[in-house]
Amino acid sequence: MKYVPYLVCYFFGISTTFLFSSERCVNIHLDIRTRPDLSASYISENANFQIHYDIEGINAPSLNDENGNDIPDYIESVAEIAEDSRYKLVNVMGYLEEPNDVDGLYDIYILNQSAWGWNIVEDTNTGSSYVKIDNDYSGNNFNSEYCLNNLDKMKISVAHEYFHAVQRAYRPNPATDHDFFLEMSSMWFEDLMVPDCNDYLSFVDALSYSIFNNPTQKFDGSDLTSGQSSANFGYSMALFAHYLTNSLESTNDSFGTTIIRQIWINYSSGVSARDAIIQTIENEFNDSFSRVWTDF
């Protein structure tokens, strides 16, 4: 297995003073980038996910267990949203299954951390990865104007990070300058799963180089300057993903849309994210990108 120091990170909702003043994601050195060693685990009902957690110490989630089955309710909630996200993406929307590691279970680790979520790539040949999320989503790092419920914050984080796992079924080792597309897609999907948490709007509102605060910005972020993050820009571009699904497709069913999946299919051929978006609009949806972008 080939290990590389590359990951996708996800911190949205932090105060804008911190959030937009620096890069939110850094490469993790190989010697410290190892899977957490936690004391307990739970396999989800449909046996697609293994949720790892501690029952004591700083990483332990709430151990509330209303149904008395010896599995903390928080852990069961993580498993439920993971399974629901997978069902929606794979069974309903037709995306490829996520690349898995040797045991066939996708691993999610519950930790006390400052990040909303991490999706960490293990193998750039197969695209296998794992996810780390927070154990309670409380504290200033998780303040959000648009998503107030801590359980909902967990749900959008799991949905977001799981879609990153699915994305690598199309391209196991995407170019880092395509981060805007990965994050645009995951922010869009999390909003489908928890539609009352429109947290991508915090980036539209507050990011100085979002497309609405800087209308001359290129749609793929290729003209970002030093200190400006392609991933941050991609969070704000979730609004463009919503625009594409709502304006270019006739379905009223959010999970019946196909345009984002088609972009991923085109992206899997090795073209740039920019070209995959343009090709999909012009070839599969018979429209002009210039018209679409101007209308947006």
State what each model feature region is.
Residues 162-171, 233-254:
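Alpha-helical scaffold elements that line and support the substrate/ligand-binding pocket
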Residues 22-49, 55-129, 134-162, 166-170:
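Zn2+-dependent metallopeptidase catalytic core
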Residues 72-75, 219-231, 263-267, 278-281:
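Active-site rim elements
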Residues 1-5:
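Positively charged n-region of N-terminal signal peptides that target proteins for export
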Residues 90-108, 172-179, 198-205, 251-272:
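Surface-exposed patches in mature extracellular/periplasmic domains of secreted proteins
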Residues 7-17:
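Bacterial N-terminal signal peptides
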Residues 268-296:
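Beta/coil-rich, acidic/histidine-enriched accessory regions frequently appended to metallopeptidases
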Residues 111, 176-225:
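Post-HExxH zinc-binding segment in Zn-dependent metallohydrolases
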